[in-house]
UniProtKB/Swiss-Prot annotation:
Catalytic activity: a 1-O-(1Z-alkenyl)-sn-glycero-3-phosphocholine + H2O = a 2,3-saturated aldehyde + sn-glycerol 3-phosphocholine; a 1-O-(1Z-alkenyl)-sn-glycero-3-phosphoethanolamine + H2O = a 2,3-saturated aldehyde + sn-glycero-3-phosphoethanolamine
GO CC annotation, single: cytoplasm
Entry keywords, A to Z: Cytoplasm, Endoplasmic reticulum, Hydrolase, Lipid metabolism, Membrane, Transmembrane, Transmembrane helix
Protein name: Lysoplasmalogenase TMEM86B
A GO MF term: alkenylglycerophosphocholine hydrolase activity
Control of this protein's activity: Competitively inhibited by lysophosphatidic acid.
Extracellular side: 48-53, 101-106, 148-153, 196-206
EC numbers for this chain: 3.3.2.2
Role, per record: Catalyzes the hydrolysis of the vinyl ether bond of choline or ethanolamine lysoplasmalogens, forming fatty aldehyde and glycerophosphocholine or glycerophosphoethanolamine, respectively and is specific for the sn-2-deacylated (lyso) form of plasmalogen.
Subunit and partners: Homodimer.
Segments on the Cytoplasmic face: 1-30, 76-81, 125-130, 171-178, 226-233
Stretches that traverse the bilayer: 31-47, 54-75, 82-100, 107-124, 131-147, 154-170, 179-195, 207-225
pH-dependence annotation: Optimum pH is 7.0 with both ethanolamine and choline as substrates. Fifty percent of maximal velocity occurs at pH 5.5 and pH 8.
Length: 233
């Protein structure tokens, strides 16, 4: 009988712990449990998007807030961890804003701050301008189609957000490992959301967007544990 996967968001089961060494630490598994439960609650409840409320906002934000708690409990201190906590907190606020269509601009602004904090954490060394050229060409190809479908008042904010997001992707890829994969999933999630919102309604768009978004935030969070020195309790 196949083994039940207790950590579906990172593709891990108890028979494959060696594929993600960090999960060998009991405190990592213990403090990831609230995130797994919160994600499961979001997808099980699946509150309709046309019924915005503070309850739906809380359910949507809970997994991200659990990651803030995870970093506080497990990650070593330092500017990298603090910047990630700030980025996650901004992301949770952005998630809440996006529940209400009239708060879309506020949500985009707060997510821009989150990406800037991720960018600050990742740093600018080594530079690797060739990688920046590749990500920029890919982003320009996507946004050249997307911007054609936007209202005039949306063009500048979306273009600015795309620039920040592309820069975060570049630095995440330079850092590599879970930060790189997290950045890729984040830009994929945002790309699906934007296309579904502004261009063409996609099947299962919300499921794809939210599953990749939560996975992206988890991977970005785990990048804080890339160096030894987990907290002990």
């Amino acid at each position: 009988m196949p083994c039940c996967d207790p950590y579906p968001w990172i593709g891990l089961n108890v028979g494959r712990l060696s594929s993600f060494p960090l999960l060998k630490y009991p405190q990592v598994r213990r403090w990831l449990a609230p995130f797994i439960v919160a994600c499961s609650l979001y997808f099980l409840l699946w509150i309709p998007e046309d019924q915005p409320s503070w309850v739906s906002a809380l359910v949507k934000c809970q997994p991200i807030l659990c990651l803030v708690l995870f970093l506080w409990a497990v990650a070593p201190g330092g500017s990298y961890t603090w910047l990630l906590q700030g980025a996650l907190t901004c992301s949770a606020v952005g998630d809440a804003c996006l529940i209400w269509p009239e708060a879309f601009f506020y949500g985009m602004a707060v997510f821009s701050v989150a990406h800037l904090l991720y960018l600050w954490a990742f740093g600018l060394s080594p530079l690797q301008p060739g990688l920046l050229l590749c990500t920029t060409l890919a982003s320009l190809t996507y946004y050249s189609f997307l911007l054609l479908h936007l209202e005039p008042n949306m063009v500048l904010p979306v273009a600015a957000y795309g620039l920040i997001l592309n820069t975060m992707l570049w630095r995440g890829l330079v850092l590599g490992r879970s930060a790189g994969w997290g950045a890729v999933l984040f830009i994929f999630s945002d790309g699906v959301l934007a296309w579904d919102t502004f261009v063409y309604t996609l099947p299962f768009a919300r499921l794809v967007t939210m599953s990749t978004y939560y996975a992206a935030q988890l991977l970005l969070t785990l990048s804080a544990l890339r160096s030894p020195g987990l907290k002990t309790h």
